[in-house]
Regions:
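Catalytic cores of enzymes
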Residues: 1-172
Length: 172
């Protein structure tokens, strides 16, 4: 299962200020609601606008994920920002990664940071290419990481070359 979308995680303090969590004064307490992904039509509810009664809001929370049977799912890849974040407790992190494990997923690829769309696309393309060549998930992912590092290094070099003659020198 591969989802390329927008991920979110808010601390309880941050959630108090967000439109979506203001729908109920108790939503911001639940870490399973403060972590999730936004799917089709989710922007409407995300901005605090009302949705028709009985309609899905397009926001898939960690709580909802944990209630889905994904026991036949070997790998979930979330090409989305900050999907591995969650509330930290003595027994681990409470967020989407725990929810996918509770749902039965064997392996998960998530991000702790904001992700660049182009770099993410290229990295995932390389990852799946390596998987189809018969490599295991770990080796394919490591190869994709090395590929994207090389790609990024080349991009930085190209930018330096492009602008090197335009940067003024400082005279002392």
């Amino acid at each position: 299962l591969h989802l390329a979308t927008h991920g979110f995680y808010y601390t309880s303090e941050e959630a108090k200020e967000h439109e979506y969590f203001r729908m109920s004064d108790k939503l911001y307490y639940d870490s399973g609601i403060r972590s999730g992904i936004i799917l089709t039509s989710g922007n409407h509810a995300w901005k605090g606008k009302s949705i028709p009664y009985g309609a899905e809001d397009g926001i898939l929370t960690a709580n909802e994920i944990s209630g889905i049977d994904l026991s036949n799912t070997d790998l979930v890849t979330l090409s989305a920002c900050q999907t591995a974040l969650g509330d930290i407790a003595s027994d681990g992190v409470y967020g989407m990664q725990r929810s996918f494990k509770v749902a039965g997923v064997n392996s998960i690829i998530m991000s702790l940071w904001q992700v660049n769309d182009e770099a993410t696309y290229l990295m995932m393309e390389k990852f799946y290419d390596e998987l189809t060549k018969g490599k295991g998930k770990r080796e394919a992912f490591r190869d994709a990481q090395l590929f994207i590092k090389s790609w990024a290094d080349q991009r930085v070099k190209e930018l330096k070359d492009t602008f090197s003659d335009k940067i003024p020198e400082i005279q002392e």
